[in-house]
């Protein structure tokens, strides 16, 4: 008898064939990688196909791969990762979709498929600058409306660009250039071969 993961993997391969870039298993969960062009069709089928039936999106986040693998990574910079749950079949799936353009990361919105994606997509837009095409209300959700940049991008300065303070003379909050001096961050040095149980 096949395990749940084997059954899910077989169902995914039967439903999508070569339209998935990859299917991998790690820590008891499957991850599929989907091209942005196929994303909406794959997402709709993941929800509607009775053999898959992922009726719930439980998380969506953005990722910036700019410094991934200490510079050895040569793929697209931005991705969105969805975590799906099938209550009916009692299994989970991670879906990764890469934005094809690093300058303007654009990924189709899945709000029409899973409405729980609404604020998650706004968060990924706010923090990473990933534009979710077709989102009904794509605007900042965590940072201030006048905020410049996207703070979770790897190239965003740690101290930011501006700081906010209360000005007693103007009796209001004002923005000013950052007054914090840049610091050089010392890299972590691991001197033991098996530091923290990791194999090198």
From Swiss-Prot:
Domain of life: Bacteria
Any GO CC annotation of this UniProt entry: plasma membrane
GO molecular function, one term: NADH:ubiquinone reductase (non-electrogenic) activity
Assigned EC number: 7.1.1.-
Matching SUPFAM superfamilies: Nqo5-like (SSF143243)
Cell compartment(s), UniProt: Cell inner membrane
Membrane topology: Peripheral membrane protein
Family matches, as Pfam families: Complex1_30kDa
Keywords of the record: Cell inner membrane, Cell membrane, Membrane, NAD, Quinone, Translocase, Transport, Ubiquinone
Record-given protein name: NADH-quinone oxidoreductase subunit C
Chain segments annotated as transmembrane: none
Its job: NDH-1 shuttles electrons from NADH, via FMN and iron-sulfur (Fe-S) centers, to quinones in the respiratory chain. The immediate electron acceptor for the enzyme in this species is believed to be ubiquinone. Couples the redox reaction to proton translocation (for every two electrons transferred, four hydrogen ions are translocated across the cytoplasmic membrane), and thus conserves the redox energy in a proton gradient.
Family of this protein: Belongs to the complex I 30 kDa subunit family.
Annotated organism of origin: Paraburkholderia phymatum (strain DSM 17167 / CIP 108236 / LMG 21445 / STM815) (Burkholderia phymatum)
HAMAP family cross-referenced by the UniProt entry: NDH1_NuoC (MF_01357)
Subunit structure: NDH-1 is composed of 14 different subunits. Subunits NuoB, C, D, E, F, and G constitute the peripheral sector of the complex.
Top enzyme class: translocase
Lineage, top ranks: Bacteria, Pseudomonadati, Pseudomonadota, Betaproteobacteria, Burkholderiales
PANTHER family: NADH DEHYDROGENASE [UBIQUINONE] IRON-SULFUR PROTEIN 3, MITOCHONDRIAL, NADH DEHYDROGENASE UBIQUINONE IRON-SULFUR PROTEIN 3
Primary localization: membrane
Recorded catalytic activity of this chain's protein: a quinone + NADH + 5 H(+)(in) = a quinol + NAD(+) + 4 H(+)(out)
């Amino acid at each position: 008898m096949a395990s749940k993961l084997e059954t899910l993997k077989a169902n995914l391969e039967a439903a999508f064939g070569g339209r998935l870039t990859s299917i991998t298993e790690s820590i008891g969960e499957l991850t599929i990688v989907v091209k942005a062009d196929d994303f909406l069709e794959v997402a709709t089928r993941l929800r509607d196909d009775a053999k898959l039936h992922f009726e719930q999106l439980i998380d969506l986040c953005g990722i910036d791969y700019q410094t991934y693998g200490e510079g050895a990574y040569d793929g697209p910079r931005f991705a969105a990762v969805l975590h799906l749950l099938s209550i009916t079949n009692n299994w989970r799936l991670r879906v990764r979709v890469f934005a094809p353009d690093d300058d303007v990361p654009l990924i189709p919105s899945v709000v029409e498929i899973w409405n729980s994606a609404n604020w998650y997509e706004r968060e990924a837009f706010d923090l990473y600058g990933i534009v979710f095409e077709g989102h009904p209300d794509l605007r900042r959700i965590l940072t201030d409306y006048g905020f410049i940049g996207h703070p979770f991008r790897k190239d965003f300065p740690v101290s930011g660009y501006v700081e906010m303070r209360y000005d007693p003379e103007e009796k209001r909050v004002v923005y000013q250039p950052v007054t914090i001096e840049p610091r050089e961050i010392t890299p972590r040095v691991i001197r033991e071969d098996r530091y923290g149980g990791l194999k090198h």
